[in-house]
Amino acid sequence: MKIKLTSVYVDDQDKALRFYTEVLGFAKKADFSQGPFRWLTVASPEESDGTELQLALNDNAAAKAYQQAIFQQGQPAAMFYTDDVKGDYERIKARGAEFTMPPTDVTASTIAMLNDTCGNLIQLTQLGRH
């Protein structure tokens, strides 16, 4: 068993696709519709066959409440690994991203937090060397 797909709820799939591709630098992997349902995923261009992130339209009341609650408490909806959190912070910030936390050293890692403009906080994580 392995993790091949995970998801984040978004309030607007087109807006999310622009943010995750143009600002974060991911590549669109899948985009198709069946009736009112749209299946939309992105993946790292460095690992085109790696884990995909589904940008799922949040049209569920319970999911919306959860999404809003973790956002308000400063909790990330997803975490992405990077080898260079400070470099990615500068690159992504230059593309217009709003960071709620600049690169910060915490136990065994350096993290930064940004707003994906679609209802989520995203954490960038660079693991420390042990």
Language model features with spans:
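Short amphipathic alpha-helices within nucleic acid-binding modules
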Residues: 19, 86-91
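N-terminal beta-strand motif that seeds the catalytic metal site of vicinal oxygen chelate
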Residues: 1-17, 76-78, 125-130
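Core segments of cupin and vicinal oxygen chelate
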Residues: 8-51
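Vicinal oxygen chelate
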Residues: 8, 30, 38-41, 80, ...
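Short, charged/polar surface micro-motifs in flexible loops or helix N-caps
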Residues: 46-50, 60-62, 85-87
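A short, acidic/glycine-rich surface segment
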Residues: 37-39, 61-67
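Short glycine-enriched loop/turn motifs at secondary-structure junctions
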Residues: 1-2, 70-75, 105-106
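Helix N-cap motif at beta-to-alpha junctions
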Residues: 12-13, 83-85
